[in-house]
Amino acid sequence: MKIGNKVINYSVYVQGKKVGDTASIELPEVEILTDSIKGSGIIGEIDLPSPYQAGSMTLSISTRVSNNPDDLALLMDGKDIEVRWVTDALDSSTASTDIIGHKAFMKCIPKKIGEGKIEPGSGQDGSFEYEVLSYKRVTNGKTVLEIDKLNGIFKVNGVDKTQPINALL
């Protein structure tokens, strides 16, 4: 069994170009849309998920300073964003550590730019926020999650969860 440990390092690519001076990344949270039902035969209310209808997904990128105008321009115009990161894991059967590669590919629309705070002796701490239209997550070369809102795709470990719905359309 592998026991996940921590992120070792990461990098960000926008339109295929590596961006420096990022401090952290917050990947999208996948929340399924719901609708409440109540009435005869139901005691109370049930908040029922709508099958594979993802709510708004947001990507956040925090930066230390805005020294490089090219990086700033890339982040402000970010449409195709790729995040790569490496984690380690302890193999409980061999007591050794393994390195695991991760990638996230996102099609985005920029929606918020935070210029940060100017204070002597401190980082500027800027931020960029994006609406995510398409999200693909890969671990060690295997696609573990793929959501494309505009093309009706919702796959988990390669299994198309929307197939039964799309087959009826």
Where are these regions (language model features)?
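A positional/architectural concept
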Residues: E26-A54
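Mixed-charge, glycine-accented linear interaction segment located at domain edges/termini
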Residues: I109-L169
